[in-house]
Amino acid sequence: MAKKIDGYIKLMVPAGTANPSPPLGPALGQRGVNIMEFCKAFNAATDGMEKNAPVPTVITVYADRSFSFVTKQPTATYLIKKAAKIKKGSGETGKVSAGTIKQSQVKEIAETKMPDLNANDIDQAMKIIEGSCRAMGLEVVEG
């Protein structure tokens, strides 16, 4: 018989550096989840990822206070900023350019994010990532 689900918690947790401090501790503590157990399991699961990359995580809390979690790929904006070598996007999108990003870099990001995106093929995924780039004030160039 399946366990009864008590609720879901959606959090953005830095890869490999989960610790009981806020915002993670209070969010898990409210549901009665063993915080240290989650931190150890999460850090082990994100061991192969780049340290401190923001990882969207969905934690399923069961009625018996046990849990399971699903980690996704780091956020698209994080991957875009890393590829374009910028600290943040443009404050005035459409007026001030924050920089450029190559089509090949967009494809690489789209391939990484493909499992998390609502796209059927790589071309659709690239369009989604290009839209994020434009929203950040980046110009997508050939190459």
UniProtKB/Swiss-Prot annotation:
Tagged with keyword RNA-binding: yes
SUPFAM superfamilies per the UniProt record, alphabetical: Ribosomal L11/L12e N-terminal domain (SSF54747), Ribosomal protein L11, C-terminal domain (SSF46906)
GO molecular function list: large ribosomal subunit rRNA binding; structural constituent of ribosome
InterPro entries tied to this protein: Ribosomal_uL11 (IPR000911), Ribosomal_uL11_bac-typ (IPR006519), Ribosomal_uL11_C (IPR020783), Ribosomal_uL11_C_sf (IPR036769), Ribosomal_uL11_N (IPR020784), Ribosomal_uL11_N_sf (IPR036796)
Function statement: Forms part of the ribosomal stalk which helps the ribosome interact with GTP-bound translation factors.
Protein family: Belongs to the universal ribosomal protein uL11 family.
Quaternary data: Part of the ribosomal stalk of the 50S ribosomal subunit. Interacts with L10 and the large rRNA to form the base of the stalk. L10 forms an elongated spine to which L12 dimers bind in a sequential fashion forming a multimeric L10(L12)X complex.
HAMAP family: Ribosomal_uL11 (MF_00736)
Protein known as: Large ribosomal subunit protein uL11
